[in-house]
Amino acid sequence: MNAGYIPYSAWVHTPEGGGRIVGESCHIFDLFRFLVGRPVVSVSVDALAPETESARPDDNAVITVLYEDGSMGTLLYTSIGTKNAEKETMKVFCDEQLFELHDYKELKTYGASADLSLKKQDKGHFRELQAFAECMVNEERFPIPWEELKETWEITRQVADCVRTEK
């Protein structure tokens, strides 16, 4: 994730804001879990050792999550890239195929049958709210099991603690 620089005086960097790792990467860990479909067995974090105040470890880290089936998800989160480039690019490698997602607008496939291009970005917020409302109205369980939500939070908390101690 090429998050771009946000001044360290901004609210997101306050204790109440939680930091960008908490505020953004948690969604990526949740997406990893959805794609892999297996529990996490370990998490490793390597944060930037900065030389200037404009590049801090809590905004610049590589996080690798290892799953029960041997799959792994790696997030490169950085604030030192240019905002002129894509913010979010994901590559999924599996079964001799490659899926590239660009800013949640375009999906390119290699070794698979179809590409997808949207006119606007779709991170699924609207559909998530619809699903939540349907669960409430119909008194159904939420589609994401509690254990998976808790696991995502535990990963996020562990990563946040690691990048804070790297300073």
Language-model features and meaning:
Residues 52-58, 68-130:
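NAD(P)-dinucleotide binding in Rossmann-like oxidoreductases
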Residues 18-19, 117-119, 140-142:
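Active-site rim elements
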Residues 63-65:
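Short beta-strand scaffold segments in enzyme catalytic cores
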Residues 1-54, 166:
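Predominantly a Rossmann-like dinucleotide-binding segment in NAD(P)-dependent oxidoreductases
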Residues 41-44, 72-73, 98-100, 142-143:
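Acidic/polar loop patches that form or flank catalytic/metal-binding clefts of enzymes
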Residues 25, 29, 57-61, 146, ...:
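Conserved glycosyltransferase catalytic-site signature
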Residues 28-29, 126-130, 156:
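A general structural signal for well-ordered alpha-helical segments in protein cores
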Residues 68, 132-167:
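C-terminal helix-rich "cap/oligomerization" subdomain common to oxidoreductases
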